[in-house]
Amino acid sequence: MKVGDRHYHTIWLNEDGRSVDIIDQRWLPHEFRVVTLKTIADIAVAIRDMWVRGAPLIGVTAAYGVAIAMAEDPSDTHLDSVWEELHETRPTAINLRWALNAMREHLRALPEQERAEAAYQRAAEIAEEDIELNRAIGANGLKVIREIAARKKPGEPVKILTHCNAGWLATVDYGTATAPIYMAVEEGLPVHVYVDETRPRNQGAYLTAWEMNGHGVPHTLIVDNAGGHLMQHGDVDLVIVGTDRTTANGDVCNKIGTYLKALAARDNGIPFYVALPSPTIDWTVHDGVKEIPIEERAGEEVSFVQGRAPDGSIASVRISPEGSPAANPAFDVTPARLITGLITERGVADASPEGLKALFPERS
């Protein structure tokens, strides 16, 4: 997508052919920074400390991490070691495991002397596949927006609420939940997006609002607890969110607070959709609440908030009393029964084993 007058992906191969460049998302929306990752340690830090984030982008970054590692040491031992090191960085996002497995399975079949080149090629393929998957998700989600727009008065916007950032910054390009929105705007459909701030890391306020602003999408930033109120008063027509892991029965694990939005949507009769590429589906898990490991992040993310100070510097300030401990679960699970549909690259599925298998019969 565009930043200013230039088109960017969130990650790309450096001109040296070995390192990778990323948009360092820790500084958005106040500063736009590109950094170069040269080692497997750089990759691990970038994923763990959320220089990059979003399940699809985490997977692609890990794939390039394997490539960097193979250029250093293409042995089986190193391949397995890198798999373990990267897998531990963000345990909830299933795309991470999917990408690491795809890389390891592809490389194990090759002689060591061929692995480095093959690894970079496969990582680039995974990145390109992500773009195509998101483009298809956008086209399928656009149909949902069109259906709602058709019931509106001419010029009346479709009012969409989204949570966290499932935008192009969470993928290589387009995004998942935002792809249908961008396509609707390109088609000329009037939309208005309500952007949850999404505490504690404020990815809605920092990232989604930045995306919407950059692409001229009408939007309003709201506090996390305002969504239910807006739904009660008819200000939301549709909720679209992303997911970090979706189970075989249609449960969705997404940023903390998603479950509450789904409950409010159900109580007010508002359709609640989840946009996801198929690598986000964990076909081995059938009960999201019981089986998905929920990442617990540092309490400091709750106790401190980052922003631009009056002198123009980026500062972190404490917002809670010293000595007050903070819990920080990063995700929650929305049961399939609360989900209207799963927007995938193959179409919109019911959030059920039958619905998913109808679109992915090879998993039957």
Curated annotation (Swiss-Prot):
It comes from the Bacteria. One of its GO terms (molecular function) is S-methyl-5-thioribose-1-phosphate isomerase activity. Pfam families: IF-2B. Gene3D superfamilies: translation initiation factor eif-2b, domain 1 (1.20.120.420), Translation initiation factor eif-2b, domain 2 (3.40.50.10470). Substrate binds at residues 53-55, 90, 203, 254-255. It catalyses: 5-(methylsulfanyl)-alpha-D-ribose 1-phosphate = 5-(methylsulfanyl)-D-ribulose 1-phosphate. SUPFAM superfamilies: NagB/RpiA/CoA transferase-like. The active site is at residue 244. Keywords: Amino-acid biosynthesis, Isomerase, Methionine biosynthesis, Plasmid. Pathway: Amino-acid biosynthesis; L-methionine biosynthesis via salvage pathway; L-methionine from S-methyl-5-thio-alpha-D-ribose 1-phosphate: step 1/6. InterPro entries: IF-2B-related (IPR000649), IF-M1Pi (IPR005251), IF_2B-like_C (IPR042529), Initiation_fac_2B_a/b/d (IPR011559), M1Pi_N (IPR027363), NagB/RpiA_transferase-like (IPR037171). Its EC number is 5.3.1.23. GO terms for biological process: L-methionine salvage from methylthioadenosine. The record marks 164 as: Transition state stabilizer. Belongs to the eIF-2B alpha/beta/delta subunits family. MtnA subfamily. Catalyzes the interconversion of methylthioribose-1-phosphate (MTR-1-P) into methylthioribulose-1-phosphate (MTRu-1-P). HAMAP family: Salvage_MtnA (MF_01678). NCBIfam families: eIF-2B_rel, PRK05720.1, salvage_mtnA. This is Methylthioribose-1-phosphate isomerase. It comes from Sinorhizobium medicae (strain WSM419). The gene is mtnA.
